[in-house]
Curated annotation (Swiss-Prot):
Full protein name: ATP synthase gamma chain
Record-linked Pfam families: ATP-synt
Biological classification of the source: Bacteria, Bacillati, Bacillota, Bacilli, Lactobacillales
Annotated source species: Streptococcus pneumoniae (strain Hungary19A-6)
Subcellular locations according to the entry: Cell membrane
Transmembrane segments: none
Function: Produces ATP from ADP in the presence of a proton gradient across the membrane. The gamma chain is believed to be important in regulating ATPase activity and the flow of protons through the CF(0) complex.
Annotated family: Belongs to the ATPase gamma chain family.
One GO BP annotation of this record: proton motive force-driven plasma membrane ATP synthesis
Amino acid sequence: MAVSLNDIKTKIASTKNTSQITNAMQMVSAAKLGRSEEAARNFQVYAQKVRKLLTDILHGNGAGASTNPMLISRSVKKTGYIVITSDRGLVGGYNSSILKAVMELKEEYHPDGKGFEMICIGGMGADFFKARGIQPLYELRGLADQPSFDQVRKIISKTVEMYQNELFDELYVCYNHHVNTLTSQMRVEQMLPIVDLDPNEADEEYSLTFELETSREEILEQLLPQFAESMIYGAIIDAKTAENAAGMTAMQTATDNAKKVINDLTIQYNRARQAAITQEITEIVAGASALE
């Protein structure tokens, strides 16, 4: 059945409207991405300073091993996973890569579902797991595009507290790491116990730089939970940056596809119009010949 010229014109107009919407969403995502990247850079400066301070306190000046439980691996009976996804769609494969990886982790390490504890940041992840009968210990929805620490403080502090209370024996964060506008990397990073403070980076003469007014263990008791919380917050910022990049790329792809559809429909319209004109000319000539 031939498509009428009016139908094609309607499709062109509708696709143009969609293209304008996706183009606007692309520009909004680009603005969000710029702010997220700046926040991520600022956090990295802070994180490097705190990591260096902790490393110096732990390993500098010939310090012995700490007995703080946040630094000591224990027998693993339960593992906690913080899964960071978005609250909405329109972000390409951003969520699917995370959810697929977490399900693979579950099948490999927790095939019977035992010892698998989850904290969800983002509604897409929470809904995905609930639909499969997996109830998160805690969930957070409605995260801002540039979340402040105050917005996530409760869930982060609660998670670290659950580790300290041995609700699980190790903690991982599953999220997409932002590489650039077109690329992100799925990461599963261990947060607790803290194991990535390299002794080789310690300042052997740190005592000449600052003097501890209380014992090292008392300082670590306060500093280590704050460090763990800040590292989780850093992963959230990183994930949000990757989400904004994915949203921008998805909307750019949608806009490009809409332009291609408009071009194809325009060609179809011109051909149909040409065929209609040819048909009219043929009918006029045939009518004139019949009158002779």
